[in-house]
Design a protein with these regions (language model features):
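C-terminal motif of bacterial Sec signal peptides marking the signal peptidase cleavage site
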Residues: 22-24
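Bacterial signal peptide processing site
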Residues: 26-28
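Glycine-rich, charge-decorated loop segments at or immediately adjacent to ligand/cofactor-binding or catalytic sites
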Residues: 115-119, 189-212
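Glycine-rich oxoanion-binding loops at beta->alpha junctions
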Residues: 119-153
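Glycine/threonine-rich flexible loop motifs
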Residues: 162-174
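Conserved anion/nucleotide-ligand pocket segment
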Residues: 212-301
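Glycine-rich, aromatic-lined ligand/substrate-binding cores of catalytic
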Residues: 271-349, 358
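Conserved functional hotspot residues or short segments at active or partner-binding sites
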Residues: 322, 327-437
Length: 464
């Protein structure tokens, strides 16, 4: 059978369940942070949509097709609060009513099964109280399912909402889970979901293979990759060496024999095209982590997340505008706007906006607007932030770093050459030279991944 899953798109009734996904998970509290972090934003549940979204998610298609991919199987589910159908019903609930299917365990990615654990914090196994099912942590002492956890399973179902940026760890936890399942003869079933940035933007530095880590598992993948998790899964299993095989030192370096033997099924969406951004889907955004609470923060993560690496740049305006606001110590909003406007970065504008400070009082900061989506290159701002940080700092902030700081920068940004040039040139670095090189390599990556794309372009000309 082709690695593209073929799904008969027959219509079925989509029922909403009553079982809450997050409540009832019991565990020890996460370890305290070494550095103070802003308070977690309050997440207000969105209402059930008045109009049925046009896009059917993988879980919707699975149910519409009569659950045939899981029928007669003992399964586990890797998911989080954003793993819901198009009505907002948790995938957990949907699978619990699947006929002739036995759901026996749950797995949780970074941020936990309830999505409230801060970035980077480890957590242990717990129990989902409403069902009594075990929840195995994949962001603690184990980063992939163990043989004991997989014992007796026929399939692991994965339903995770990604945000389209390479360092967001859900594509990594998926790959690690796939590796474990392939090694121990367990099928992987990926329920596909939209890339909220769409499937056209491919941008930023590719991941140098030696920079593999928990925030980067796919060699030569640009920071904004333009793929869905289902497409990434197909690439990880069936791709050739340049884009799928990691160095032997990696804990995700499977042999070709094991990868070929592994069984992967991707249940694709219906109605999604590559030119669709999240608002075009008609789906409501459910937070994927404590600070990615809106579609606006998804955009910001791609835009400024790398710019804060090993610099004094900060994101947010007080408690508000996660990843959309930017600040720099001892620089006023006007000074920041003037400095960044001088670079004439296409597709964005810097404006003053009011947020809420830590003391609850109003605070003014700089907000980054996307003014022209077609001209906007998602990651470009981050590299001018690096350049400006070196200009504003008394000493080059990219020299004199510890080995851990160097490693952190490289695994997030991906490019050894960019870091080396930052160390050498500091504020004199030639950003456009690197942007041009990365654009050329992004075009190559588009061609290398073309055969794994499951969805048409939409009304945008092919090849873009």
């Amino acid at each position: 059978m082709s690695f593209r899953s073929i799904v008969k798109l027959s219509l079925a009734t989509l029922a909403a369940g009553a079982l809450a996904l997050a409540p009832g998970c019991s565990s020890k509290p996460p370890k305290p942070e070494e550095k103070p972090k802003p308070p977690l934003p309050v997440v207000v549940p969105a209402p059930v949509p008045e109009k049925l979204p046009a896009v059917m998610l993988g879980i919707d298609v699975l149910e519409a097709d009569g659950f045939k991919e899981v029928a007669g199987k003992k399964i586990a589910l890797l998911t989080h609060p954003a793993g819901v159908n198009r009505l907002g019903e948790p995938t957990l609930n949907v699978l619990l009513r699947a006929p002739r299917t036995k759901l026996v365990a749950l797995f949780a990615p970074e941020h936990g099964f309830d999505g409230q654990i801060r970035a980077g914090d480890n957590f242990g196994d717990m129990v989902h109280t409403p069902t009594g099912l075990p929840i195995y942590s994949l962001h603690g002492k184990n980063r992939k399912p163990t043989p004991k956890q997989l014992q007796g399973l026929d399939a692991l179902v994965i339903d995770l909402q990604d945000i389209g940026s390479r360092s967001y760890t859900f594509n990594v936890v998926m790959r690690r889970a796939m590796d474990a399942c392939f090694q121990y003869g367990v099928e992987v079933i990926v329920l596909d979901r939209p890339n909220p940035l769409g499937g056209l933007k491919v941008d930023g530095p590719p991941l140098d293979p030696d920079n593999w880590s928990g925030v980067g598992a796919h060699p030569r993948m640009p920071y904004v990759h333009g793929l869905t998790l289902g497409e990434i899964a197909l690439m990880a299993k069936n791709g050739s060496a340049p884009i799928s095989q990691l160095p032997a030192s990696s804990d995700m370096a499977l042999s070709d024999k094991v990868r070929e033997k592994g069984k992967l099924t991707v249940v694709p969406m219906r109605g999604w095209t590559r030119n669709m951004r999240w608002p075009d889907t008609g789906l409501r955004w459910i937070p994927t982590s404590p600070y990615i609470t809106t579609y606006e923060s998804v955009i910001g993560y791609a835009m400024v997340g790398l710019g804060t690496q090993n610099t004094d740049w900060t994101w947010g305006i007080g408690r508000d505008f996660a990843f959309r606001g930017i600040g720099f110590p001892k620089k006023t909003p006007d000074e920041i706007i003037a400095a960044m406007n001088a670079y004439k970065i296409p597709g964005i504008a810097f404006v003053k906006r009011q947020g809420t400070g830590a003391d609850g009082k109003p605070i003014t900061g700089v907000y980054v607007e996307v003014t022209d989506w077609d001209k906007w290159n998602p990651t470009e701002l981050s590299f001018y932030m690096h350049k400006q940080a070196a200009r504003w700092s008394r000493l080059n902030p990219f020299t004199g770093l510890t080995s851990e700081e160097v490693r952190s920068f490289k695994i997030h940004v991906g490019s050894n050459a960019w870091f080396a040039e930052l160390q050498r040139a500091g504020g004199r670095i030639d950003v456009p030279l690197f942007l041009k090189n990365w654009e050329e390599r992004a075009a190559i990556y588009r061609e290398q991944t073309r055969k794994f794309r499951l969805y048409p372009w939409g009304d945008t000309p092919a090849g873009k």
